[in-house]
């Protein structure tokens, strides 16, 4: 048992208004700490910069998803239309993004005091995740600020936020998640289905705009091969090789190492069915990334694409894809290339997290074992 899990057994933690409340279980002893105090002290006096926009992709992970493609479009516009805009990208890896982003985009380290200053003074927040972690550190939204939530999912397979029973059992998380939802001014949806999910999962989400996801614009560009060339160059893959992309999601209650697939057998099955020589790329979910997991991937017959900045480019480059419960496969569907679902823990995952619909209702061949996946590849029609 870890120290953290032991502490949870002894101490109950929740949120009450602007206070963290720690209670020793089975006693009346309570400690209340105003978690917004530091933020009030440091940033309440700061004025809003009307031309500042802060972008953040999934808690500072890479340069991708919907925030990237909004920023990309701004940078493509005539300079006279965007002159004076202060564009800020928040990231955990500034050193990786400096060669990618133009000089006019300021890069700020995620979770730093500078990042909180940027949030405090920006007119517009463009994000694709719940800011529970930042709110837990005291982040506050001022009335004159605008928060656009673009989300990172698609036609969600797994249940999210308010639709997920076990998440709602965490009272501290629930209080901050509801606060995040109340802060949000606009939600960007890709469909009626997603709109209905937003309304339920985000506690009566406010103004929902069915504009589609900006990140999927790249699938409709004329030169689709540019992304394959870019990925092949990044990983030293020969131009004639085909790319198989494995993108598993996380497990809420399992932080162990990702079970490897029979990658060599998968490559053989793909070669038998579709021809060509295949290379396997694996991308870990940000919540599964660890030093041990990265080291484990090095020992397998795969390319580790976890740190590649933009997953959409990987999707555009791939010739075939496998996931378990990541809705990214619906984005990949826009390529009209073969996609497969490998759900080895289907029943357990459904019980803990839950699905919005049976996976058999999707257009993707479903396998529950490695052997079934190999067979689904061989008979793919």
Question: Positions of the model-derived regions?
Answer:
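Catalytic binding pocket for nucleotide-activated donors in carbohydrate/polymer assembly enzymes
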Residues: 297, 320, 327-381
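Extended catalytic core of nucleotide-activated donor transferases of GT-like folds
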Residues: 68-72, 77, 101-170
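A nucleotide-sugar donor-handling region in carbohydrate enzymes
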Residues: 23-38, 157-166, 170-254, 286
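Conserved catalytic-core segment of nucleotide-activated headgroup transferases in glycan assembly
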Residues: 63-76, 201, 213-295, 367-369
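Short, conserved loop/helix-junction motifs that constitute active-site signature segments
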Residues: 138-144, 179-183, 271-275, 335, ...
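Donor nucleotide-activated moiety binding/catalytic core segment of transferases
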Residues: 107-122, 286-330
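A short beta-strand/loop micro-motif in the catalytic core of glycosyltransferases
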Residues: 125-126, 184-191, 281, 321-322
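N-terminal pre-catalytic "stem/leader" segment of glycosyltransferase-like enzymes
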Residues: 2-116
């Amino acid at each position: 048992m870890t120290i953290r899990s032991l502490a949870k057994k002894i101490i109950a933690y929740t949120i009450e208004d602007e206070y963290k409340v720690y209670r020793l279980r089975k006693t009346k002893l309570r400690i209340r700490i105003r978690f917004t105090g530091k933020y009030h002290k440091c940033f309440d006096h700061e004025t809003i910069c009307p031309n500042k926009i802060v972008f953040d992709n999934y808690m500072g992970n890479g340069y991708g998803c919907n925030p990237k493609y909004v920023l990309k479009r701004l940078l493509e516009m005539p300079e006279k239309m965007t002159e004076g805009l202060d564009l800020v990208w928040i990231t955990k890896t500034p050193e990786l993004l400096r060669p990618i982003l133009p000089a006019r985009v300021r890069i700020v380290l995620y979770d730093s005091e500078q990042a909180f200053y940027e949030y405090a003074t920006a007119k517009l927040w463009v994000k694709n995740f719940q800011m529970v972690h930042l709110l837990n550190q005291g982040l506050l939204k001022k009335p004159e600020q605008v928060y656009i939530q673009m989300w990172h999912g698609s036609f969600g397979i797994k249940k999210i936020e308010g639709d997920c029973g076990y998440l709602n059992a965490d009272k501290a998380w629930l209080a901050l998640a509801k606060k995040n939802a109340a802060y949000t001014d606009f939600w960007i949806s890709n469909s009626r289905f997603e709109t209905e999910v937003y309304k339920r999962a985000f506690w009566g989400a406010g103004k929902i705009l069915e504009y589609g996801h900006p990140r999927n614009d790249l699938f409709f560009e004329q030169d689709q091969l540019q992304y394959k060339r870019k990925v092949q160059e990044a990983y030293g893959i020969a131009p004639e090789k085909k790319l198989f992309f494995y993108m598993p999601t996380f497990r809420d209650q399992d932080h162990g190492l990702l079970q490897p697939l029979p990658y060599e057998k998968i490559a053989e099955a793909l070669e038998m069915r579709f021809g060509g020589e295949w290379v396997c790329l694996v991308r870990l979910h940000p919540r599964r990334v660890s030093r041990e997991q990265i080291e484990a991937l090095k020992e397998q017959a795969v390319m580790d694409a976890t740190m590649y900045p933009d997953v959409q480019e990987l999707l555009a480059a791939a010739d075939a894809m496998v996931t378990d419960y990541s809705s990214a496969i619906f984005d990949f569907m826009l390529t009209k290339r073969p996609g497969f679902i490998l759900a080895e823990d289907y029943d357990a995952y459904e019980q803990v997290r839950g699905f919005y619909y049976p996976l058999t209702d999707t257009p993707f061949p479903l396998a529950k074992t490695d052997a079934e996946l190999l067979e689904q590849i061989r008979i793919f029609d």
